[in-house]
Amino acid sequence: MRPALVATLAGGILLAACAEAGPAPQTAPGGKATLLPEDRLALPEFDLATYESLIVELRGTPVVVNVWGSWCPPCTVEAPDLATVSREFEGRVQFLGVDILDARAPARDFILRYDWQYPSVFDPTGAIRDGLGYVGQPITLLYDREGKLVFEWNGVITADLLRKEIRKVL
């Protein structure tokens, strides 16, 4: 991911998280920080135009976009696989989550529960999904280095299928 874009996404997430900062996180067994609800990640709100601009800006890097919701049972099924595959391709493929039709607190909890290390944006009305012409969720989209959509999957995606499709664009 381009350094400026990483800084923008990370800065937006961290700035919002720090704006509400309270006491320092408690360390849980295993060395992971347990954040109090008021200290958890804030998801930047996106719309279709911002999403499309982001895909253009990321040209040169393959991008996996996953449209999800914390309330979506199939999304919970695929969440661990997304975390695993995103780590396997870290530095070579940019992952981006798009949380739709959700409330911020459950969305933050979902991200923390599945230990996603990639950015996720907040689309409370589902405008991005609807604007792209999809129905239902989860949806996984893969864009090649030129920013062209080369693979789409509506429903639960497996780690094996996602790996196979990513390898085609590397």
Question: Language model features by range: what are they?
Answer:
Residues T76-Y114, P124-G131:
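Structural microenvironment flanking redox-active thiols in thiol-disulfide oxidoreductases
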Residues N66, G97-D99, L141, E152:
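Soluble periplasmic/extracytoplasmic beta-strand elements of cell-envelope proteins
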Residues A42-V63:
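A short beta-strand-turn-helix
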Residues T61-V63, W68-W71:
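Short pre-active-site segment immediately N-terminal to redox-active cysteine/selenocysteine motifs
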Residues S70-V77, I139:
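C-type cytochrome heme c attachment motif
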Residues D109-Q117, P124-L170:
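Thiol/disulfide oxidoreductase modules built on the thioredoxin-like
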Residues T61, R92, Q117-Y118:
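A generic structural signal for alpha->beta connector loops
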Residues M1-L48, R163:
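N-terminal targeting signals for export/organelle localization
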